[in-house]
Amino acid sequence: MSNAKSLEQLEQTQDFIRRHIGPSPAQVSDMLSALEVSSVEELIGQTVPAGIRLEQPLTVGESRTEVETLSYLKSVASKNKVFKSYIGQGYHPTHVPHVILRNVLENPGWYTAYTPYQPEIAQGRLESLLNFQTMTLDLTGLDLASASLLDESTAAAEAMGLAKRVSKAKKANAFFIADDVHTQTIDVVSTRAEQFGFEIIVGKAADAVNHEIFGALFQYPSTTGEVVDITDLIAGVQSKKAIACVAADIMSLLLLKAPGKLGADVVLGSAQRFGVPMGYGGPHAAFFATRDAYKRSLPGRIIGVSKDRLGNDALRMAMQTREQHIRRDKANSNICTAQVLLANMAAFYAVYHGPQGLKTIAQRIHRFADILAAGLQAKGVSLKHNTWFDTLTVVSDSKADVIARALASGVNFATNRDGEYSIALSETTTRADVAQLFDIVLGEGHGLSVDAIAADIENNGSTSIPASLERDDEVLTHPNFNSYHSETEMLRYIKRLENKDLALNHSMISLGSCTMKLNATAEMIPITWPEFSNLHPFCPLDQAQGYQIMMGELHDWLVNITGYDAVSLQPNSGAQGEYAGLIAIRKYHESRGDAHRNVCLIPSSAHGTNPASAQMASMKIVVVDCDKNGNVDMADLKAKAEAVAENLSCIMITYPSTHGVYEETIREICDVIHQHGGQVYMDGANMNAQVGVTSPGFIGSDVSHLNLHKTFCIPHGGGGPGVGPIGVKSHLAPFMPNHSIINVPGTNEGNGAVSAAPYGSASILPISWAYITMMGSEGLKQATEMAIVNANYLTHELSKHFPILYRGRNNRVAHECIVDLRPLKELSGITEMDVAKRLQDYGFHSPTMSFPVAGTLMIEPTESESKVEIDRFIEAMVSIKSEIDKVISGEWSIENNPLVFAPHTQGDVLGNEWDRAYDRFYAAFPVPSVAKNKFWPTVTRIDDVYGDRNLVCACPPVETYRD
């Protein structure tokens, strides 16, 4: 057999590469022929400037099979020790209902969707997020809630920012934090305050009123477990015209009076213990609520109820003009990616258990705390407080002995305070656990009976929650929280919502700058392993050796891929990565006596988070012009760099550019900035066009953030989670984020944290680790090359029908292109919005609309899409062009055509009335391929103006279900 395959070929060691990369060799050949090149290498040579091509290949190892990868990672995970965690401090063990685990967390219909900017094809997760907001409003007792923030600590930092914006104490520049707030929250808020130039005052809660402040933060219950009435504290803060913020435990709010009812202006916290694993720190969804009067200052996305074209209720993201991509340096926050997938899990947890089920869980946790307290006090153990919900703090001279017994028993307590330790109970606590806790604290032979103590408490009651703070109002009364308590009903509810949403498991999502590539199943499997999901972020490091190995390997690979010298994995979104990178630059300048360097140059084409992040780092922004080809105007750059040379801090630049081209002058740009004493911050949003071909460090950049949820395959989750690690050159490494509880090696001791957990959203890092492992050095390079091939083929075909706005050398684009719809709009009146909505009828999510240029679509196919799917998208765009031509010719009027009526629902096309200039079948099935896999939007076009003018951000009242 002369043509027999080699053993190496039969072993299929590189099989994952062909699974990840969409086009087959034959399809690649066809695309190259269309581009009139003979090889991928020839196309790359025409596209990527020779001067920035890597001289050496990546060294992240050879590709491994899926089986090998998971087997090795399982052996690494086994080095983690999963102790019973009673550490608390914002992180608690929880039971993830299996119906949610399997059908949401492990379901690509939920985890591969994008942020719901196209609401007509996102009504499912929008409803779930509205449930999350309704849950937040009910439990906090406030008027308005957002659809999740990154974690409790960053939510507290956002609360400080809101307080400064809305407080009438305009001369005050100090923010007060009670000393019984979680340590990590004090850390993160202090980091944010340092950049804003705010003073942080940490002290006894009662002292807040003694300071000139614009806001204050209290913990409810306190980090050591005390439950106190904070009504007077809140009133005292408000008497200073300051804003009273409360970080609350979400489970406790089933039993405790809502902070809003106590007078709080802002209530925030983590929804983690509502069915989301601890995951060594994340990801978790934070909740955030405030008064209606402050709605324009609310950070994060807000889901609101509006009307569609037919007058039906429909959901959308409300008040989007507040967001960073529009407001830029004037935005309330730089937050972009939030925690939608985790918010949905928490919302489904509340839906599944309902108000009575949640209250029962909270009562059980509290009862066990009462039992534990009664037993310990009966034996003379001194408790720090007389009130509690779930956490007891023991004051002890024998702390070391108790902790030693705990560790020997596979148990963790909170030990980060001198002379005391805390025991935080959770949903997972059992009678046997309480008996074990007696043994650990008291030693053997104590003679206590859990059952006997429980009976005594049942007979005599408990005073550990003051009567004045007992919750007496009903919560979660909406039907969504009272209808789906059997698994059958819950399963169908989840499926019903999933069916309303278009995700990657249905079709290509070609959002430019978003890199919606394959999130392989093998990459996702490890995140639910208990060895990764059940660790507390503050557990002793010797219990997290598996994590340290995995994160260490990922760190080294990212260093190699980026050409930097060190990486921080702490930032839990790209925006947080930008913020952390800019802080590193500021601290570097300060260390050299150059604290005055505070000017950030930003090209006019920059992503909206860039100016928003720069203003968060208190930098002065100077905008650099772009030329007619979309490149940085070098003359303008040089002039402005020279003009601000004494105060130049950095430039923020994206590469390839946000316009989708490899700018030839990128190294010259870096040189200009360095010559004037500045640093180069390269936005990693387009790293998918660099890996293995070039790198930020090789080009000359000093720091970048990476979007692991773009280039490195963490799914977008419908709007989060994300991970935004930063890579830096050696001179910036000491200035990366540290942490107040778990020291991060290689960083200066005084560096603050930017995320609540030392390693951010650690439990999803195995996704990127697995992607790199299975692709290997060669596979990663092939992925970049194929992203470039797909983008150029798509551009070539679309250019026959639409103008392409920007191109680079040899008329090539990088990994995305911008289709200019403005000429067609002038001729026809058809807008980019009309095109985006009509694409839904063809089964596609719209590309990025009106960014970075108004009136355009930015399209990024990624390497994971086959030529078949790309051709299907091209067919849709060409068909839409023919529809626009009919409007231009007068065959269809601007008022009566399928574009302005798009999208079309089943109810629309099957309705009794039809007065359109086109037939019903064409409305829904404009090309034959649509019929093979038809996706039906569930609402017609949504009225954005109505939604903002009539803001409703909670589930509609029961009456609407009767209509």
From Swiss-Prot:
Any one GO biological process: glycine decarboxylation via glycine cleavage system
Task: List the keywords (alphabetical).
Answer: Oxidoreductase, Pyridoxal phosphate
Reaction(s) this enzyme catalyzes, per UniProt:
N(6)-[(R)-lipoyl]-L-lysyl-[glycine-cleavage complex H protein] + glycine + H(+) = N(6)-[(R)-S(8)-aminomethyldihydrolipoyl]-L-lysyl-[glycine-cleavage complex H protein] + CO2
Please give one Pfam family short name.
GcvP2_C
Q: Does the keyword Oxidoreductase apply?
A: yes
The protein's matches in SUPFAM superfamilies, at most eight in alphabetical order, are given as: PLP-dependent transferases
Q: Which residues carry this modification: N6-(pyridoxal phosphate)lysine?
A: K710
What are the names of the required cofactors?
A: pyridoxal 5'-phosphate
The molecular function GO annotations come to: glycine binding; glycine dehydrogenase (decarboxylating) activity; pyridoxal phosphate binding
What's the EC number here? Answer: 1.4.4.2
Q: Which residues form a coiled coil?
A: none
Q: Name one GO cellular component term.
A: cytosol
Query: Which InterPro entries does the record match to this protein?
Result: EF_Hand_1_Ca_BS, GcvP, GDC-P_C, GDC-P_N, GDC_P, PyrdxlP-dep_Trfase, PyrdxlP-dep_Trfase_major, PyrdxlP-dep_Trfase_small
Q: How does it assemble?
A: The glycine cleavage system is composed of four proteins: P, T, L and H.
Q: Which family does it belong to?
A: Belongs to the GcvP family.
What PANTHER family does its record include?
GLYCINE DEHYDROGENASE (DECARBOXYLATING) (PTHR11773:SF13), GLYCINE DEHYDROGENASE, DECARBOXYLATING (PTHR11773)
Which HAMAP family does the UniProt entry name for this protein?
A: GcvP
The protein's job, in short, is: The glycine cleavage system catalyzes the degradation of glycine. The P protein binds the alpha-amino group of glycine through its pyridoxal phosphate cofactor; CO(2) is released and the remaining methylamine moiety is then transferred to the lipoamide cofactor of the H protein.
Its recorded name reads Glycine dehydrogenase (decarboxylating)
What is the protein's species of origin?
Pseudoalteromonas translucida (strain TAC 125)
